[in-house]
A protein has these predicted regions:
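Positively charged n-region of N-terminal signal peptides that target proteins for export
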Residues: 1-5
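Bacterial N-terminal signal peptides
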Residues: 6-16
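Noncatalytic, solvent-exposed loop/strand surfaces
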Residues: 20-533
Length: 533
């Protein structure tokens, strides 16, 4: 019997997707980072694994050790799994030299994790491995069940058939002002959408007047980055967005008025050159593809998020508020302060119980905090907008209809060892050593030893039915029931691990397909769930 939530969610999803779906026959697949609908969410009647432990080998169907780490998410189509890693380093490589330009695309068997084929994906741009905000392997592959597309952020797109035969390749220039490259490629209407600069021979491209890698030079000296469209079958460039898009932003596609659109943003840290800062909704198809529907300007826009919206409203973060915009016009419908007045459920370390604080300021959690989320962690599921806070280790939930704000504090880490009781850490963590499967340290940024909240590009969350999966750099995955009437401790379904505390590191997004969760860290990729009957 279908649950009332499932029926309601299907109804809401049908409204949201009234214009169609981006990839035919993808309902039970996970064809790109943002899932079958491009929304980072899906519904299912299949089993949803919500509890597991790689440390204890609990609810793990298979594990595949990887020769080198990487940061991409995982695309799945039937019995095929696609992802990328960095090219394996020589074993005598020092920590200071853990960088490279090339990555490797993988195709695994979804039933047992066996390697079906791999492909080398070179590029001209060298990047540090295991970067705190991205590396060359960060883009998740996309697939439609007939082809798979891989992107090396350093400057190369590849299209292969499902057997590994190359169909086409296309080079592009990767800007060197920022290491961060947050865009996840999108497949919609036989187009691959990706954020990059115009080609060097494009007369509309702004001239490059800064020296490469001179990141502190004036932003106006640099060319802009845009959402660009490429023919999925040939790699031919189709159109370039009317307005720029920041490298910090993860654009999201959807449908407004039955038409495919993409919501994107400009702004962020280290002065991105694309101006004016703010949020835009742009067309994806037909004769006006790339043209803006509207542009909402804001000098204080928080852009290092997935840009979520539905058919009626779009959501942006701005100076400690969630801004609710009309999806058709961009007009501000509501400004919801996030940190001034909220119901906050905090863990009391003395009483070992949760305490509820009504209509409280977030300052009761911590007196020093940034009014923004952990990078890339917001998600929209039904009427609720959820995110991981920058400080305080709380999951925030906003009712976008009523404006009610709630916070639930969660453990920083759960340490598990076979035969030993779990150790729950609330205000400290065991730092990851940042090693790959060969025991080589590859995470050279000292901030890589932090707990994975705050100033880091976390793997973006996904939603499967009511369950939201949030992941952190130290290998924790929180499963949250997003639809609980009261957002208290009952909404924390589980805290799961991707491996041993202190030896696990991940900035990847999980994926769901046909009753299984797929996830990864530097050392291995895992399939979570049970064998099919």
């Amino acid at each position: 019997m279908k649950s009332p939530f499932f029926l309601l969610f299907i109804l809401l999803l049908g409204v949201a997707l009234r214009g169609g779906t981006p990839i035919p026959h993808a309902m039970n697949q996970w064809p790109m980072a943002s899932g079958p609908h491009g929304t980072w969410a899906t519904t299912t009647e299949d089993e949803i694994p919500v509890r597991w432990s790689v440390s204890n080998d609990s609810n793990i169907l298979w594990k595949r050790v990887l020769p080198e780490g990487g940061q991409s998410g995982i695309a799945i189509w039937n019995d095929r799994v696609f992802f990328t890693t960095n090219k394996p380093l020589r074993e005598d490589t020092s920590l200071e030299e853990t960088e490279g330009s090339d990555i490797i695309g993988y195709c695994l068997n979804a039933e047992n994790g066996n390697v079906e084929w791999t492909v080398d994906i070179p590029s001209p741009k060298t990047m540090p491995y295991s970067g705190l905000f991205s590396d060359n392997s960060s883009a998740t592959p996309i697939t439609d069940g007939k082809h798979v597309w891989f992107i090396n952020h350093g400057g190369l797109m590849l299209c292969h058939d499902m057997n590994g035969k190359e169909v086409w390749r296309r080079s592009f220039e990767s800007r060197t002002r920022h290491n961060a490259k947050q865009c996840e490629p999108i497949l919609v209407n036989d187009q691959v959408l990706f954020v990059t600069m115009r080609d060097s021979d494009d007369p509309l491209r702004r001239s490059m007047r800064a020296k490469p890698w001179a990141r502190n030079t004036a932003p106006e000296l640099w060319p802009w980055t845009f959402i660009r469209s490429f023919d999925a079958g040939t790699g031919k460039a189709l159109w370039t967005g009317e307005s720029g898009t920041s490298v910090h932003n993860t654009p999201r596609m959807g449908y407004v008025g039955g038409k495919a659109v993409v919501f994107h943003a400009r702004g962020g840290g280290h002065r991105p050159p694309e101006i004016p800062y703010g949020f835009s909704m742009s067309r994806v198809s037909e004769e006006d593809a790339g043209r803006e529907l509207w542009n909402h300007q804001s000098d204080r826009a928080v852009t290092y998020t997935v840009s979520h919206f539905d058919e009626y409203f779009a959501y942006g973060l701005d100076s400690g508020s969630l801004i609710k915009l009309d999806a058709r016009s961009g007009e501000v419908v509501r400004d919801i302060p996030l940190f001034e007045k909220a119901d906050i459920h905090l863990w009391n370390a003395t009483t070992k119980q949760y305490e509820k604080h009504l209509d409280a300021s977030f300052s009761i959690v911590t007196d020093r905090f940034k009014k923004e989320p952990t990078n890339q962690t917001p998600i929209l599921t039904g009427k609720y907008y959820l995110f991981m806070t920058h400080e305080g280790h709380c999951v925030g939930r906003v009712n976008t209809e009523s404006g009610k704000v709630e916070y639930l504090q969660v453990p920083v880490q759960v340490v598990r060892k076979q035969g030993v009781a779990d150790r729950v850490l609330w205000d400290q963590h065991i730092s990851s050593d940042g090693t790959n499967s060969r025991g080589m340290k590859t995470a050279n940024d000292r901030r890589s030893r932090r707990d994975g909240w705050g100033h880091v590009t976390a793997g973006s969350p996904i939603a499967v039915n009511e369950f939201v999966f949030f992941s952190t750099m130290i290998g924790m995955t929180y499963v949250i029931d997003s639809q609980k009437t009261v957002f208290d401790e009952s909404a924390l379904i589980s805290v799961n691990d991707l491996g041993q505390a202190g030896r696990t590191w991940s900035l990847s997004t999980p994926s769901y397909s046909q009753g299984r969760i797929f996830h990864r860290g530097l050392k291995q990729i895992v399939c979570i769930g049970s064998k099919r009957s």
